[in-house]
Amino acid sequence: MESRNTVLPSLPNIITGTSNSPFQLHTLPNTNFPSDDQGDIRLPPLAASAHIVRPVVNIYKSPCDEERPKRKSPQAVDFLSQRVTTSMTPLSKPKKLSSHSPFTPTVRVCSKEQPPQSMHSYKKVNILTPLSAAKAVLTPTTRKEKKRSFAFITHSQETFPKKEPKIDNARLARRKRRRTSSYELGILQTAFDECPTPNKAKRIELSEQCNMSEKSVQIWFQNKRQAAKKHKNSGNTSHCKVHSNDSMSMISYSDAALEITSTPTSTKEAITAELLKTSPANTSSIFEDHHITPCKPGGQLKFHRKSVLVKRTLSNTGHSEIIKSPKGKENRLKFNAYERKPLGEVDLNSFKN
């Protein structure tokens, strides 16, 4: 197959259209761009040409298009000529376009003095600001705001009994403690000695005298009764401890006395002499009967005997008393607690042989 080498026509021949080339029918469309004397086409600037709607021109002309008369829009020619002159002379001032031109863009210029209508009237809140500050900016603050009342209140000595707190739970309000003076304590103590449980009328009278409320007087009497009860219970426990110690010492002394009855008569006199030396200084008991048998140990000792002769020697009076009990009857001996004297000084030379 043979290959054809097609050669494109020159640019002047295409513009003039005088050459008999095969590309004569396919001439370039008329773009209505002005050219200078040398034939160079000057294009308008991009900023101005961006708003221009360019018509779509088909390169291949149809016979219908050839029959139509060529009409040039004078407005487009005037606009392009003005743009070319402004591009040629940049130092010259641009001419104002006519208001009736369809190619003039309508741009609204916002002056600095007049703010745009889209701006909001309130300030923008920063995200980092606390919530309280944001609420203060967005919500309007009222001058006359209602004051909140809380249960944690304080009173002085002058306003405490007169002005009660204006809250719902006034009875449960936590008040500041006040110290009672010595004069007020004397009045309350005197009333407590007369009657530990005063009635309401008496409490009101005391509250007026002590410059206190009736509730405070009632609480003071309650605390005083509890303190007196606690003091009484502590005294009873200490008395019981002393009594138990006395009973233990009494039992130990009675056991030593009972050992005498089980010893023979030859050694009884020696043990009795030793017992009298170690016995309490107030009194001493000597049992002369050998038939003493204890029944029950405890605080009180009970003895069964046929004939008992008890001799009590009283050291403070210096005389002896003899008590005879009838035969076949029980006699109870009560041993009291005696104070024991501390041991004297011991001579170490007495232990040497």
Swiss-Prot record:
Expression induction or repression: May be regulated by MCM1. Regulated by SWI4-SWI6 heterodimer. Down-regulated by nonfermentable carbon source.
UniProt superkingdom: Eukaryota
Subcellular location: Nucleus
Residues with PTM Phosphoserine: 315
Gene3D superfamilies: Homeodomain-like
GO cellular component, one term: chromatin
Keywords in alphabetical order: Cell cycle, DNA-binding, Homeobox, Nucleus, Phosphoprotein, Repressor, Transcription, Transcription regulation
UniProt key word Transferase: no
Pfam families: Homeodomain (PF00046)
Database matches in InterPro entries: HD, Homeobox_CS, Homeobox_DNA-bind_prot, Homeodomain-like_sf
GO biological process: cell differentiation; G1/S transition of mitotic cell cycle; negative regulation of transcription by RNA polymerase II; regulation of transcription by RNA polymerase II
Region listing for Disordered, in residue ranges: 86-106
GO MF annotation terms: DNA-binding transcription factor activity, RNA polymerase II-specific; RNA polymerase II cis-regulatory region sequence-specific DNA binding; RNA polymerase II transcription regulatory region sequence-specific DNA binding
DNA-binding region: 173-232
Function: Transcriptional repressor required to restrict transcription of ECB-dependent genes to the G1/M phase by repressing their transcription during S late phase. Genes that contain a ECB (early cell box) element in their transcription regulatory region are transcribed only during G1/M phases. Binds the IMEI regulatory region in vitro, its relevance in vivo is however unclear.
SUBUNIT field: Interacts with MCM1.
Official protein name in the record: Homeobox protein YHP1
Annotated organism of origin: Saccharomyces cerevisiae (strain ATCC 204508 / S288c)
